Amino acid sequence: MSEMESDILRAGWEAWRRNPVTAVPFVLHGLSVIAVSIATLLSAIYAIMPELPAAILSGDFGDEAFKQMFGEFLKRCLGNIELLGVTFVFGLVIVAALAALFKAWWIKLCYDALEGKAILSTAFHHAKSLFVPLFKFELILTLLIGIAFIPLINLGLDFFRNIHMLTKEAALYYVISFMIWSAFLGIFAITIQFLFTFVPYAIVIDLKGTLSGIRRGVMVLRHNLVDTIIMWLLVGLAGMALQVAAYPFRFFGFWGTLAGTLVAVILGWVAVMPITTCWWVELYRRRSKTLNSFPNG
């Protein structure tokens, strides 16, 4: 690790330690996404099979009745693909909007923390002014990844339509196809995230528009590939450290695993994500100074 990376890691740690309020947007974002996801899922379930939630909550049916109801639920899902699609897209748009608002907030907050003092209200006011360009970027990102999901969705729908008449060879085909497409999607999503690493920072820190922010972010990446790869590895190690910390809880069964997951999520929101965001902000600040600015667009 070079001296510059060491300085960045130290600066991020000190900024978070002096300004623990940097964790607030991450916590609020996480809770908001969970709430929206649950609300969207329950709305879809209730629209497709209104009697299902009440039946599950009553708990007055056995395994066989549950299997029958679940089978009926799958049939109704296949008959309401359009409704599920609209609900899913609506949920994605809401999540993208939340990501844009909170991401602008925490980037500005971490930037201010590195400067010396982070104030929630000041950073939030700045975030609101940049919501539109960052929201457009989040929609572009969501659209790119969403389009890549279409073959996998079609594969899953085809599987459920033919589930009662599948041969062993056909089942093996679906399993292999699913694994291949899942691997492709994972690689594609990681590649897109990597290429657009610095775009949110360009929009929030340099006050760029959506397109000029994309150009600026890609340019910073192109001139700093090695540093970016190293930073991604360091961020990945920080995430792995959370998993290691939560691993001992697994020895206590289901509830222990659940508690360990909860601890890892909370530590991620409160410490790891603010610190690693400070790292990215500091890296962007240092590396973008040498580049010519693009006009807003």
Curated annotation (Swiss-Prot):
It is a multi-pass membrane protein. GO terms for cellular component: plasma membrane. Keywords: Cell membrane, Membrane, Transmembrane, Transmembrane helix. Its main location: membrane. Pfam families: DUF7847. It is found in: Cell membrane. The chain crosses the membrane at residues 26-48, 80-102, 134-156, 185-205, 225-247, 262-284. Signal peptide: none annotated. This is Uncharacterized protein AF_0863. It comes from Archaeoglobus fulgidus (strain ATCC 49558 / DSM 4304 / JCM 9628 / NBRC 100126 / VC-16).
